[in-house]
Regions:
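Proteins synthesized as precursors that undergo proteolytic processing into mature forms
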Residues: 128-172, 177
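Sec/Tat signal peptide C-region and signal peptidase I cleavage site
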Residues: 43-49
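Bacterial N-terminal signal peptides
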Residues: 33-43
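C-terminal, well-structured catalytic/ligand-binding subdomain of enzymes
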Residues: 51-102, 107-108, 118-142, 175-434
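Bacterial N-terminal signal peptides that target proteins for export
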Residues: 20-33
Length: 434
């Protein structure tokens, strides 16, 4: 532990300088993007409107912790990258436009079974003119994934960063020892919430959007999305329903707005009763969503290599959930492809969403209109309805392979490659029919 503290402290000094230098052009880009968004939209919009949760193994059916995030960003085209880290290798979600030039990651898991994600918080720090809000968040995830093995080591990592750290985020963490926690982090400190402690998590989970409980009251953003995530998880945790497939279907593809008391799947917003269009406001998946990932951890004593990243690149209602493990055996479907300047699955999902879901482009501010009829309809041939049976089949096949590996105690690299190839073949066959 002493070596980790010293090493992390020394690295953090140069790390902060690197963040300032590397982020200069990125800061300008983000400022221009925010200005454009403010001009184009006639109503309030959220930037980086992520939704997340950390789930204790105490309330999952198999006793394994879960880490869920749905990521919203200006960088919608993503891929998954395998990185040989300083201490631990890891697989993480990255921006295809600027990785590896910028050593930033947004959610991932490493060879020790340590997994980390973040949501941008907007009520922890008074950002000064010229500062980029949370400019260090992605860099910190990258560094922590290559240095940390446990929740406790992540605490020490945060403790030893040079201050101000330029972090403003809610970080969700799980590890191979059963650890599961949420950290609300600002420039000078953090508040930790333990998902295994009933005082912090009476229902066995902790959800966050874009505000922090330790921050200023009723400031930040994402309160309506929080209502939906928290309410859905609360009921499911009492019935041991929370699995990766359940999370992607009930959360990453939720079209409920609890403030409006709207659930688009009730059919009332479909033809012929309605137009089949709705405004994309405060649903968990959004037109700015780039991916949703659920990391399924291991039980204490299990091989950390069995930690599984259930990965959906792109807009969740038009994407497919596939499994990944920390290995250099990265399947082409989620890796960077120069033809698309992103992963094929990311490009496919985003393109489908732009063409058929957010398809109305007539003047400024129209990108918020959601063609719900194209996603889900009473005839049962909406995009989401057609993709989900294929996804369920891929999930069952992957679960069967994972069960064998858990029984043998480790992943089989040959089987892993065969599984990836089988999944890719089924996806390609299905998409060709569309």
């Amino acid at each position: 532990m002493v070596n980790l503290l010293i090493e992390t402290h020394n690295l953090s000094k140069t790390e902060t300088l690197t963040i300032h230098t590397a982020s200069f052009m990125k800061t300008i880009t983000h400022l221009l993007a925010l200005l454009a968004a403010a001009v184009c939209l006639s109503f309030a919009a959220e930037t980086w409107a992520c939704t997340s949760a950390v789930i204790s193994g105490k309330v999952t059916p198999d006793g394994r912790p879960l880490l869920w995030n749905i990521r919203d960003t200006d960088f919608r085209l993503n891929h998954m990258a395998y990185v040989k880290g300083q201490r631990y290798d890891f697989v993480a979600n990255v921006n295809s436009a600027n990785f590896p030039a910028l050593k930033e990651a947004w959610m991932g898991s490493n060879s020790a079974g340590f997994a980390l994600m973040n949501t941008q918080s907007y009520n922890l720090v008074e950002v000064k003119p010229g500062e980029e809000r949370g400019e260090a968040n992605g860099r910190i995830i990258y560094r922590a994934l290559e240095l940390c093995a446990t929740v406790q080591e992540f605490c020490h990592f945060l403790d030893t960063l040079q201050k101000p750290s330029y972090i403003e985020a809610n970080f969700g963490v799980i590890d191979a020892q059963g650890g599961a926690a949420m950290f609300e982090v600002d420039y000078y400190g953090y508040t930790m919430y333990d998902a295994n402690n009933p005082k912090d998590a009476p229902y066995g989970y902790i959800a966050r959007t874009n505000f922090s409980f330790a921050g200023k009251v009723n400031q930040g953003s994402g309160y309506v999305r929080y209502m939906e995530a928290d309410g859905t998880l609360m009921q499911a945790s009492a019935m041991s329903q929370i699995t990766p497939l359940w999370m992607v279907n009930r959360l990453s593809r939720s079209f409920c707005n609890r403030l409006l008391q709207v659930d688009l799947r009730d059919g009332c917003h479909n033809q012929p009763e309605a137009s089949g269009w709705f405004v994309d406001q405060d649903f968990i998946p959004r037109n700015s969503t780039s991916c949703s990932i659920i990391v399924q951890g291991v039980k204490p004593g299990e091989n950390p290599a069995l930690t599984t990243l259930w990965t959906l690149l792109g807009y969740p209602p038009t994407g497919l959930l596939v499994p990944l493990w920390v290995s250099d055996n990265m399947p082409p479907m989620v890796a960077y492809d120069a033809r698309f300047k992103a992963a094929p699955l990311s490009h496919q999902s985003i393109s489908m969403a732009d063409r058929q879901v957010f398809a109305y482009h007539q003047g400024m501010g129209t990108g918020k209109y959601l063609h719900w009829e194209a996603l889900w309809n009473r005839q049962g041939n909406g995009l989401m309805q057609q993709l989900q049976p294929l996804e369920a089949e891929l999930y069952r096949q992957s679960e069967a392979t994972l069960t064998r590996w858990r029984q043998s105690g480790k992943p089989d690299q040959k089987e892993m490659k065969q599984l990836y190839e089988a999944i890719e073949a089924k996806i390609q066959e299905s998409l060709l029919r569309w």
